[in-house]
Amino acid sequence: MIQAYKILGTGSYLPDLVVENSRFSEIVETNDEWISSRTGIKSRHLSAGEATWEMGVKAARNAIDMAGIAPGKIDLIIVSTVTPDYISPNMACIIQAELGASNAFCFDINAACTGFIQAFDIAVRYLATPAVRNVLIVSTESLSKLTDYSDRKVCVLFGDGAGAVVISDGSKVAETETGLESDTNSEENVDEYVYECFIGADGTSGHAIVGEAFMPARHPFIPADAPESKPRYEHNNGSFFTMQGQEVYRFATTMMPYAIEKVLERSGIPMDQVDYIVPHQANDRILQSAAKRLGIPAEKMISHLSDMGNTSSASIPICLDREVRAGRIQRGQTLVLTGFGGGLTYGALLCQY
């Protein structure tokens, strides 16, 4: 367990454009009943022109405002995304510039829908170093960029949005934007913050979720007799996502509960001491299956699928922020955050809000 961290603030952002299930009947053969009964999704938010970085900035500002720290106090920015606006510069550097967080070093990660879990774990490990005091994590996704809207099984699943958290080293004195100081790891709460993480991957199943076409070598010095570059995966859908739905379902319903069990086993904390599980929002049937396998009531598994759909790595921090602002998740509660996604990747982390 790691005691030296604290979630200071959460934030989220969803675009204004809301697309109800009924709209999809205009472009593919489907209807609201077919979509909602199979996914639990009734609507989703889609960008009407906002870039991935723009949504990330808005979520980040909300998290920073809640944290009560100045952007200049942020030491590290980690962005998780599978839909960056540029190969370079990375999204974290763009967000740093927009926030004025000039003292932060920055990088992006891509672990698909598990990205926020991995970013959180990286952040906690950096907080153990003397150079890092405050970390901003931003998960921001424009999945509409990669969605084939002629594929009725895929296009109804995804939404756009961003979520963010500010995490601080709880063993150090946190300085707020107003200049007030507070010891976030005083003697009365030295045991308040617990942490454990379990992350895994199965690269042999990478074909189950593939996005963006393979780009072969194309420089002018390729010899005429050179072998042709071959993609690792067969992908004939341009830059759009392709997904093997049944294979992903089997993976998710097996590995997400497994990751949760492993993280609880490592921490020594039993399931009945966990207040809520905040899972990646992919499909209501997956969440129901995971709850059943874990033997927990459905209400312990947080779900906001109905009005946001699958927002990839942004889904967990969006749900976390919504629950915090609604007052359902409160200080001192024990949470398990868990996800699975392309790679294939999976993971869970135990934390205290």
Where are the regions that the model predicts?
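Buried hydrophobic positions in well-ordered alpha/beta secondary-structure cores of metabolic enzymes
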Residues: 7-9, 35, 63, 77, ...
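Catalytic phosphate/nucleotide-handling subdomain of diverse soluble enzymes
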Residues: 321-338, 350-353
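Flexible, glycine-rich active-site loops centered on histidine and acidic residues
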Residues: 126-162
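Condensing-enzyme catalytic core mediating Claisen C-C bond formation in acyl metabolism
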Residues: 1-49, 151-250, 254, 258, ...
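A contiguous, well-structured pocket-lining segment that forms one wall/lid of small-molecule binding clefts
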Residues: 227-305
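Acidic, glycine-rich active-site loops and adjacent beta-strand->loop/helix elements
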Residues: 12-13, 80-85, 111-116, 139-144, ...
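Conserved beta-ketoacyl condensing-enzyme motif
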Residues: 7-9, 50-110, 263-287
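Conserved catalytic cysteine-centered active-site region
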Residues: 34-38, 42-54, 82-135, 291-319
